[in-house]
């Protein structure tokens, strides 16, 4: 499976008087630049799931999300990119006209399957998954947000982008003291913690998640 252009994820320094006065350096890993749509941590969460889809021989992928889910948008784009059928189980009714996320997903060929909020809460129950198989046919299941063990494995690779970056080679500091990120399901944060723990670096950054 073709990797996205990870060399397009530079680390850029932020300059501000407040940072200078506090003697703090702040740098941003620009994961938003690796692809117009499958960017941020979404690619890393999907990568090994999609490799498993390829390995299993499955051609249809199903996942869950709300009406404004970035995961659903990224999965729809990835499905189109890699030639996979995609199905999104959407929480709540589909309101016409569709919002920009669902409209885009549909344009990518994704099937939108709305369920009640009550049924959506059953998304982790085997019985409900069986009902979806009966209704929709065979599919490879990716959890809500793309968060599972394969996602964590993918997010570990973000650590490599930091440690192998030209920025770190040129930095006066051997390693950042902290790595901060926004958190939803927590998969990206867990992947970073796991990835850093496997590093050979003697000094490792503390990972901070903001929700």
Please provide the spans of the model-predicted regions.
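PLP-dependent amino-acid enzyme catalytic core
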Residues: 1-211
